[in-house]
Regions:
Chain A
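Polyanion-binding surfaces on beta-sheet-dominated domains and ring/shell assemblies
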Residues: 1-258
Length: 258, 249, 249, 258, 258, 249
């Protein structure tokens, strides 16, 4: 951490002692969320461009045909990949997905998978052939809280997704069978601890001051949780984070579905 | 994919109020712990927990490479979680996959939260976890073994790390899932705590839990962790006694 | 393979003297440009060109690694061209392939020919190009966006880089091929120039062209580049005006 | 660039101001080209060892059986790989193909592919099975202009190539069906700019002094062009390079086919 | 080599001049060998945990189903992999198998393969389907002579291996057809040269003092040999090493089979 | 897998006391050697041996990277053995595989045993071996070529390295196996020696040999190596004569 980062962190922390955030938001207030579904619709069956404050994430869905898992021969397959593109931050390096990208991808994936958001049973085609939904998250500008932006983007893009036509063993590009069957809208909410406070949707300055964080992904139940980073929570703090996450997810879900 | 799951979706996991292996809902599997089991590490531990067999060892504090990533205020603790190819029924290709990268990270985070890393600026402390046989819950077994190995190495710690998972099977909240319960269950909630203060060091969840089920499951995992803590303390104490007795011989 | 081409080899690309999308032979697709679109870069640009959507951003000048490859006489400019997995109809595996390595190199070469790199010895300037949607001609779109981002970053340049492709379809020379024309056409000739002096900075060709067809196609690409140049200038000027206006508010 | 390289470069450039080359060649004169077809004929269906001055390149062709591209189900497949072996120069490192090797491979590949030199339609075997022609360029001694040496070697090796026998789903090694069907002889000619002059076939000293370069691959038409490296051409220089490339390619073609 | 390693080496060498070893063993004496077969029996079809002195190696066998080699369509396949896990020594790094791991794997593999220890012809299942035996050697504590520990572990684990049931194209996990057919017990013995002496089973200190080494793997004949490392042997020394290897292998074989 | 072996297991390799290519049991294949064949290396050699064609070249002594692995007491000699994709009938994927890593190591070890590396502390000497056509016995051909290239480079050597393999076919011990003999034979025993002292520098074996067969095979390989040694000496001598003659011209 260089001196500028240290000063920012210090400033954020001291404001927080008075219960204030650097951009004057309430502790449980998200930055503005803008969702442009169908951003890459000329090529991708589904997509969504997310602005979460000045964090920018583009999620695209590709639909391929492949083999099911041997233990679920009649279910489709989903897979989630996150690319922390170096354009998004001078701190990201080029190269294969690293620890941070993998963790984000796996947390986003679990929320969608465990909530059953994609009705995988409807993605069966014929023996040994099922649809594979590739969820590719492309992080373009890291202004903080890319995990929530990725999660919001992923389910938004899935809601935008059309199922391609498939005839005689061939995918017909540009023709559609209907929508991808989506059953619910899981939303991740990341709670970070700064001093004795919990706040949601940290911006970049707040991430420097963050002690640790907990992401809770909910539908009408909890579907995924992930504490991430060095540092500790009390069990009361965890409970508070869960409450907040249910509440915020409900608000965000309306924006996503709206 | 760790293992192929069988297609029997309606497998009953609770029969007559008992789990498939005869355990009660709040009962842990059999556990065996040992420290100081390797010669080339500064600290090591071995844990058998149900059918899991996990070895942990520590190298360092030692020079950290590359130089420009050193931290002048503290040691960088890195845990590497690795599964032997033959630790699962369907052979796992050697080398890190995405799952092991994530587990390595969450264990590193948890251990770093209690180790007094400030004592060793500019160095690296490397904790290696080898899963020799896997049967659900390996991340908890690994963190327990890693914490023992770290304590055994003499790196000062504010507290031990104890861990245990709970989950939901056939609609019931139970502790410490074994393989079949993990495969066909509805939820997995691994928790690691610093047992003296009760702080949460690791918390992951996947599946589905209502708000109330979560509270029940969380408490069950914490209770399990506390039992583990007692075993960890005894193991470390016994090793010191052995050490003293060994010296006197 | 960027995309699967359909097997219709005798597809007509020119009907009644018009191209499939209604354009004349010397007509460019619709183009939209913007600069200063990202917060974490020192310069950035976004270009929509037909169905192409390309984002470019610059980090640096900054320390160049590894140390022993630094140039004590100038900055090393490196462009990295990357296509999003979903930017094409058949998902592209993430990560560099041979095609993107080549395009990265020719864009790096073109930008390095006009940027005043001598001003920043020992440093690196990194230009990142993200293709968010691809529809033929991405290397020209990318170089136009990269050049805007570099200008937007304040690195001094002897000239902008403007670019446009021409090609041959159904035996006719046309400018700015879209996807179907690229797939079923007979030739592709991307050209980048420094528009004030008219120097050639990038020139690639594949297909077949007679000597005379080449001259015609080259001139058409240069004419297209000049139109692009006017848009680039306007975009940069507008951004400065906005900047001044923004400051006055 | 170390001091020796700098002095060489300086010497080449100052000679060039008088229109002279360091080895007394004319500006549009190639070094001696020696081609030994069938160099590896005991194992490879086709091969050619090229000496271009003291640049040495060995090209081998392997013929495999595989699946066609879905969009061209009745056409064979070709692929080109260039290995800049570290034995060839103290400046090459071991490891996977790098930027330079990839660029050379792709320029050589385009010349052959776009000219239709290999009659890929004749490489169809049966449904979902076609011949794959692997063109492997092995650079063994880098005395300058390895791109042209690679291109000359590739088409020479292809002209040397025999098509293996294929019976009952098995390639019969050591027995041949006939020659690989080759329709024309594309030749790349690399023009480098030194001061205000263009020269062909640069030797190593001239490569140090090179400002930029343009490769033009021709048959009776232009099939591929590639400007490579930092630096600029005027459009007149490009025209001159094209003229020269047609002329030199014609001469070289006679050597290759002869 | 740091100063401590240098002093150890020096001490070992000077003792050896008097014909003595640092741990008082005879020149042709192994450290204690402990073999726990079935160590990972809950998951792996075969396994063995080896203590060779304080060297610890765990070998696991996985049985998969795959295609045979085209030239041996009715024979099973075996493959050997050695992982020098970083836990085993502060000198091992993380990452893909390196030179040393590859050499050990290949020497262990050759002993088993060339002796025909696995009756591969009995691993045929049906057309294009055979059993693949994966031998994975996991080195956990490097107290010297990991090659012999790996070789002893590999054949011990193979002797422990059960063949899974295979019905209707599916491997039935947890049910067994019988034992993996093993025909003989190849044993590698590594002889290291220190000064003018040859010793077997070097401990870590002796490895620092080692000039070079020769591994001889025998059944009733020699099946594999490998000189490894810089340094030379006279042909008499090779002969002596072969004699010793036959003798020690016989003793070790009894421990393995017993 | 280097090459697909045909399924003819009962192929006769010895007919009327002669081998398939007409050789006697103790007869080498045709061999041709040359040094100083490359311009960019400090030493180089080319060896044709039967249908094998192998090129070797040396770069260095030169700076060794990475720095922290340098040896202050001597040069580090590294041999890299590489097979061209087209050197075998079934194309080999470019890049190192496990076999070539092992062969690179045993050749490095053998050359390091005779080169006077102490003369060049802190440096690296890189020996590159390119197999241009392979037909059994490439490791012996490679070590012979590498040794010639190293001698040609002027690095002082205590002795040359000569090498030859022997083996068992149809129950008979023979020298210098060609492809079919290697594929269908019972054993392969490559040996490299320092011919003046008779020291063993490389020794590998796989197959099956009784104690007595080993002795016979070993002696045959050493005899072969000695013949090779005579050719190596003559080659080096001729090159010096040429060099002197060339200088006088």
């Amino acid at each position: 951490m260089n001196i500028e980062e240290y000063l920012r962190k210090d400033y954020v922390t001291s404001l927080m002692r008075e219960g204030r955030r650097i951009d004057n938001r309430k502790l449980d207030e998200f930055r503005e969320i803008k969702i442009e579904k169908g951003y890459s619709s000329e090529k991708a069956p589904g997509s969504a461009f997310i602005n979460l404050g000045d964090t920018k994430v583009l999620v695209g869905i590709s639909m391929g045909v492949g083999e099911p898992y041997p233990d679920r021969p009649t279910s489709g397959v989903m897979t989630t990949n996150v690319e922390l593109r170096p354009i998004a931050s001078p701190l990201f390096e080029s190269g294969p997905p690293r620890e941070k990208a993998i963790e984000i991808a796996r947390v986003v994936d679990r929320g969608i998978r465990e909530s059953g958001a994609i009705d995988l049973d409807k993605l069966y085609i014929e023996e040994d052939k099922v649809w594979i939904a590739f969820i590719d998250v492309h992080v373009l500008d890291d202004g903080g809280n890319i995990l929530d932006a990725a999660g919001i983007g992923a389910i938004s893009a899935l809601l935008d997704t059309r199922l391609p036509k498939y005839e005689d063993g061939v995918v017909i590009r540009g023709e559609w069978e209907g929508k991808l069957p989506i059953t619910c809208t899981p939303v991740p909410v990341t709670n970070v601890k700064i001093g004795s406070n919990l706040v949601v949707d940290p911006n970049l300055d707040e991430e420097y001051a963050r002690e640790t964080q907990l992401t809770v992904t909910t539908t009408d139940v909890i579907n995924a949780m992930q504490k991430s980073g060095i540092g500790v929570f009390s069990s009361e703090e965890v409970d508070e984070a869960i409450e907040t996450s249910f509440k915020k997810a409900k608000e965000i879900r309306e924006i996503i579905e709206g | 994919m760790e293992e192929i799951k069988m297609a029997e979706k309606d497998m009953k996991l609770i029969v007559n109020g008992k789990r498939l292996d005869g355990r009660n809902f709040d009962e842990l599997r059999k556990i065996k712990m040992e420290v100081n089991v390797l010669e080339r590490t500064v600290g090591s531990a071995y844990v058998e927990w149900g059918n899991n067999k996990v070895l942990a060892g520590v190298h360092g504090p030692r020079e950290f490479h590359p130089k420009f990533l050193r931290d002048p205020t503290k040691a960088i603790l890195t845990c590497t979680y690795n599964m032997a190819a033959f630790s699962v029924e369907d052979r796992k290709r050697p080398g890190p996959d995405r799952r092991s990268v994530e587990i390595s990270k969450v264990i590193s985070d948890a251990l770093s939260s209690v180790a007094v890393l400030e004592k060793y600026p500019n160095t690296g402390i490397d904790v290696f976890v080898e899963v020799l046989q896997a049967d659900a819950g390996t991340r908890c077994v690994s963190i327990v073994a890693a914490s023992l190995a770290l304590a055994n190495s003499g790196v000062p710690m504010k507290d031990l790390v104890s861990a245990c998972a709970s989950g939901k099977i056939d609609g019931e909240i139970v502790v410490d899932l074994m393989k079949e319960e993990d495969n066909y269950g509805e939820c997995d909630l691994p928790v690691a705590i610093s047992p003296r203060k009760g702080d949460v060091l690791l918390l992951q969840m996947d599946g589905n839990l209502t708000r109330d089920e979560y509270t029940k499951a969380y408490n069950m995992a914490v209770d399990g962790s506390k039992k583990i803590y007692e075993m960890q303390k005894k193991t470390l104490l016994d090793s010191m006694v052995n050490f003293v007795e060994g010296e006197q011989k």
